[in-house]
């Protein structure tokens, strides 16, 4: 399939006075998180919230800073995520891609907004037990509590 890149805009929502950064991010479907090189985290003045132990493709583990929040913008979509500070390029993992309802288009070698929901990102929310979707229009105070754990 080759490498697929996306032009993103990254910003620090805690510091709106800072300019956003335009970056070319590699879509990495093997990664869950947004990963940022250290110089990007410094430019955005992102606060380290904690350390995270990560396992990389070669099987080795390391502790890396977890920073955030980061506002990620792609076309008409935005999301707010934490990011791992590691590597030498921006990696767009599956969590922010799903949050913004983006799809990989191998034939176009690009990331695209889901054509089934072009104006508003779609999210599927399910009960943790069973496969029934939650109908939020039918939930009332008298409804059974939903166990999200």
Segments predicted by a language model, with ranges:
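Pepsin/retropepsin-fold aspartyl endopeptidases
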Residues: 1-141, 146-149
């Amino acid at each position: 399939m080759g490498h697929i890149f996306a032009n993103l805009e990254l910003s620090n929502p805690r510091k709106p006075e800072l300019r956003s950064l335009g970056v070319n991010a590699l879509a990495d479907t093997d990664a869950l998180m947004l990963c940022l090189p250290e110089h990007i985290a410094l430019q955005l003045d992102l606060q380290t919230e904690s350390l995270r132990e990560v396992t990389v493709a070669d099987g080795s583990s390391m502790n890396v800073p977890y920073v955030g929040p980061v506002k990620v913008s792609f076309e008409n979509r935005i999301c707010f995520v934490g990011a791992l500070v590691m590597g030498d390029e921006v990696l767009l993992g599956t969590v922010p891609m799903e949050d913004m309802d983006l799809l990989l288009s191998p034939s176009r070698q690009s990331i695209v907004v889901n054509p089934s929901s072009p104006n508003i990102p779609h999210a599927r929310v399910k009960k943790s037990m069973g496969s029934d979707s939650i109908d939020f229009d039918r939930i009332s105070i008298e409804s059974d509590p939903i166990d999200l754990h």
